[in-house]
Structure formats: C-alpha cells, structure tokens
Amino acid sequence: MISLISIIPIIVAGISGALGIFILALSFARKIEKIQISFGCAALAVMLYGISTANLYNSSTLIQANLFQRMQVVSIILFILTYFYFVIHYLNLIFWKKYFWICITIAVLAIIPHVFIQNPLIWNTNESSFHLIKFFGSMQIINESVPGIITEISFGLGVVVFFLITVKVIQEFHGQKDKFSHPLFLSTNILFIALVNDALMGLGVINSIYILEVGFLLLIGLVAFLLSKNIMGAIATKEALEIANLALQVHKEELEKTVYERTQA
C-alpha cells in the first residue's frame, strides 16, 4: 500500500514530467532557443526527484531507502545544473556562459560517488535516521541512511551553488518594484528556502518536514507560466511577420503588374 505522504511527490513527478516533455517537444518542433530546452530538462530532473522521493517514502528496508536517497541527490544535482544554465541564458550572464563548463565538471564529480561508490563516506547504510511526520492526521515514518562526509559536502555545495543562483536573480531584479510578482524572482527564492530547509533536515540540524518537492512544484509552475507567455509571444510575432511578408509579396506582385501594364501601353 502506498503511504499517504508519497502523494505529494507523485503529483510533483507527474506535473513536472508532463511539462518537461511538452516543453521539449515544443522546443524541438519549433526550434525554440535553448532557454526552453534547459528548463524542460530541469523539469525532467524534478520528475526524477519526485519518483525517487515517492519510492523513498515507501521503502521497506534501509538498503532500498538508500538507493532512492542516491537518486534524490543525483536528481537535485541535475536540476541545479540545468536550472543554472536556464538562469544564465535567460538573464544573459556572459561570465557564466563562458565558464559554465566548470559547473558541468563539478556536477559530474558530485554525481559519480552516488552512482558508483558504496562507502560510509558517501552513505552509511549501517546507521539509520528516522523522521516522524504527521500528514493529514496520519503519522508517517521515514527511514533513511545517514549521509557520509562526502554527501554532507555535496549538500553544502548544492546550497552554495543555488545561493549563487539566487543572488544573481536578486541582483538582476534589484530596484524593480514588481520583482515579487515576477515568476523567476519569486520561484527562485522559494526554492532556495526549501533547499536550505531540506539540507539542514537531512544533516539532522533541524527537526522539520521535507518541503523541497513543494518548492520544486511551485518553481516549475511559475517558470512554465513565464515561458508560456514568451513562447506564445514568439509564435504571435512569427505569425505577424508571416502575414506582413505575405502582404508585401502581394503588393510587390501588384506593383510589377502595374509597371508591366504601363510599359505595354
């Protein structure tokens, strides 16, 4: 039986996956720029996080739980990488465009231990950490492996990188009165708070509830709304140009016809 608390990550996975596939399909069909493609990939990373979280909440053994904890970390790294790529191109951050390969290198080095290495320095599967969460009147128990020092460093590095993303977004909207209503500004700050909360909870620093999947859902929804306006605007502009070109072609043909008739007179 599926635990009640896994409903939220299942919803997150479904919505994010559908949006990611739709945006990528639309991008490839219309050859829309890589901003949309990178966000589509970020949405698929959120889908992977939702799937791994739902499975973690329903794990019956510590070994099984650890597998999905690793998937969670990998999906978060992939999300941060693709979302950072999206932000630097959306805001046109020239410096980070040039040195984005550094982010790719760090991401690959961070992913490798969680995929290939079984060691207490990564995850200590001999120790467990229990979280009791009350969800709609039902007490849920989440059993997890204790993160090793390398994983703790990964958590810290992830928070630092996303803090950098958040700072760049805040700087871009500095002085704008309507910044709190802008989807990019609002969603990035919400997710940063959720990421810090979950990282501190995963390290055992605070006793809270995991809210990262909710933060992911809000970000995906808000940024998808932002991109939908941009995409529809681009499509409308393209259609307007096509109509204008058609009108010019008709005018050209009429002008050529008039000139021809006068030369024959």
Predicted regions: what is each one?
Residues 229, 233-265:
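Amphipathic alpha-helical coiled-coil "transmission" helices that mediate dimerization
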Residues 2, 9, 33-36, 40-41, ...:
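Interfacial "cap-and-anchor" motif at the non-cytosolic start of specific transmembrane alpha-helices
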Residues 20-28, 76-107, 166, 228-231:
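Internal transmembrane alpha-helix with an interfacial aromatic "cap," most often the third helix
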